[in-house]
């Protein structure tokens, strides 16, 4: 029994000595293990991760490892890692990104999952918090209040811009007067639509010819005719038109009569007069006073004596006047055929 007990005691002592040696070795050289683990935990070339997106247990282990590394002041590798920590922090600060978990409302992102131009989506199918990093310094997604932060690499320089959310857009009334005032030629003063002038030319359907009463007859005994005219005006315009402007409409020519004109009966200046002394006394008076005129002496009508030809300039302007009156006559016929439209 004694030799067996001694053998068990000797084996127990050997096992305790090996454990003590291992613990002393780990205590004398803790930097190598910590540095090896720290090198695995830092990746400067990969995408930066937000602290919110990491596991709390991993965060505690990293802080514990950093604490052990910083307490060892005599190790060269620990010194190098301590000097590299500020550089790593500066590198992480230059990346303009934020965690998805920092958003208080998940409805700010578009329903279809699309992002703005210049934004890289690193979301995965896991349930962990998602981190979004922007590839530019001025592009970012809007938050719930419609604000985004630019130039976030410097904490002292922060730019906030107010933006309207898409849901706050209102429908613009295109027919409103204020909207019409904003639409104008660049460089000009905005002004509303001009109001209709009271003195402007009325529309064609509002114009109609109004003829005045007939004037007295004018006898032309030598030509055996008589004529009368009447003035006219266009309804809607002030003033009257020239009397001879519309010859076909406002000038009437008829054969002269002795009742209306003081023409010479002996010369038969009104040969087409059918009312030659309708009463019996007039016929007897005519028969007793004048003898019948031979047929070969009757001229219908008696032409005036030939006069010298007018000057070429006068003839030219006469033709111009006749042409203008013809044009006016054609226009006036359109007005007379068009029925006036009365506005209520």
From Swiss-Prot:
One of its GO terms (biological process) is regulation of cell population proliferation. This is Protein MENT. One of its GO terms (cellular component) is extracellular region. The lineage of its organism: Eukaryota, Metazoa, Chordata, Craniata, Vertebrata. Its main location: secreted. Coiled coil: none annotated. Residues 162-182 have a biased composition (Polar residues). Involved in control of cellular proliferation. Onconcogenic modifier contributing to the tumor suppressor function of DNMT3B. Keywords: Phosphoprotein, Secreted, Signal. It is found in: Secreted. Residues 1-22 form the signal peptide. Residues 162-197 are annotated as: Disordered. Phosphorylation sites are present in the extracellular medium. Pfam families: PMSI1 (PF15322).
């Amino acid at each position: 029994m004694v030799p067996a007990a001694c053998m068990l005691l000797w084996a127990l002592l050997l096992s305790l000595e090996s454990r003590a040696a291992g613990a002393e070795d780990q205590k004398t050289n803790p930097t190598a293990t910590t540095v090896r683990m720290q090198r695995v935990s830092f990746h400067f070339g990969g995408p930066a991760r937000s602290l919110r997106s990491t596991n709390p247990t991993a965060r505690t282990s990293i802080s514990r490892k950093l604490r052990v590394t910083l307490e060892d002041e005599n190790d060269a590798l620990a010194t190098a890692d301590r000097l590299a920590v500020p550089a790593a922090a500066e590198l992480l600060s230059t990346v303009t990104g934020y965690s998805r978990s920092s958003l208080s409302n998940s409805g700010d992102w578009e329903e279809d999952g699309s992002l703005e131009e210049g934004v890289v989506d690193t979301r995965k199918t896991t349930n962990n918090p998602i981190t979004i990093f922007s590839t530019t310094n001025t592009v970012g997604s809007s938050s719930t209040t419609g604000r985004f932060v630019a130039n976030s690499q410097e904490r002292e320089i922060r730019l906030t811009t107010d933006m309207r959310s898409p849901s706050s857009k209102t429908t613009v009334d295109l027919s409103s007067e204020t909207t019409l005032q904003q639409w104008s030629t660049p460089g000009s003063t905005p002004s509303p639509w001009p109001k209709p002038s009271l003195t402007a030319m009325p529309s064609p359907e509002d114009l109609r010819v109004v003829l005045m009463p007939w004037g007295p007859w004018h006898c032309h005994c030598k030509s055996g005719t008589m004529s009368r005219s009447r003035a006219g005006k266009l309804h809607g315009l002030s003033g009257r038109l020239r009397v001879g402007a519309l010859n076909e409409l406002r000038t009437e020519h008829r054969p002269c009569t002795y009742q209306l004109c003081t023409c010479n009966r002996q010369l038969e200046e009104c040969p087409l007069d059918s009312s030659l002394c309708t009463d019996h006394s007039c016929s007897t008076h005519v028969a007793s006073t004048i003898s019948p005129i031979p047929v070969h002496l009757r001229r219908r009508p008696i032409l005036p004596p030939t006069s010298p030809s007018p000057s070429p300039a006068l003839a030219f302007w006469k033709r111009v006047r006749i042409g203008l009156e013809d044009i006016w006559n054609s226009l006036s016929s359109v007005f007379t055929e068009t029925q006036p439209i009365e506005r209520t």
